[in-house]
C-alpha cells in the first residue's frame, strides 16, 4: 500500500502565524477636569511637568479646562495613560488640590 503524505517544510506553521495582523494597542485620552478650587497656575505646572507641554500650549489647555469643563492633555497607550493619571492625582493630593484627572478610551 502506498500512501501519499505531504510533509510540511520546517517552520511553515510559523510563517502563517507571522502573517496574522497585530492590532494596534487601544489608545486613551488623559483628561483634566475643572473644579472651583485648583489654581490655574497649578494646572499649568501639571501640564508642563507631566505632559511636557510648553508654557503656551499648557496655558491653552488650562483655559480649555477652565472654560469648557475639561480638556485632553495627551493620548497614550493604556499603561502610560494610567501612569499619567496616577502621577497627576498623587501630585495634586500632595499639594492639597482636588484636581480630577481621568482617562477615556479613544
From Swiss-Prot:
Q: In this record, what's one Pfam family? A: ClpS
What the entry lists under InterPro entries is as follows: ClpS, ClpS_core, Ribosomal_bL12_C/ClpS-like
Gene Ontology annotations of biological process type: protein catabolic process; proteolysis
Which domain of life does this protein belong to?
A: Bacteria
Q: Which family does it belong to?
A: Belongs to the ClpS family.
Q: How does it assemble?
A: Binds to the N-terminal domain of the chaperone ClpA.
Query: Which NCBIfam families does the annotation name?
Result: PRK00033.1-3, PRK00033.1-5
Q: What does this protein do?
A: Involved in the modulation of the specificity of the ClpAP-mediated ATP-dependent protein degradation.
- Name of this chain's protein: ATP-dependent Clp protease adapter protein ClpS
Organism of origin is Vibrio atlanticus (strain LGP32) (Vibrio splendidus (strain Mel32))
Q: What is the lineage of its organism?
A: Bacteria, Pseudomonadati, Pseudomonadota, Gammaproteobacteria, Vibrionales
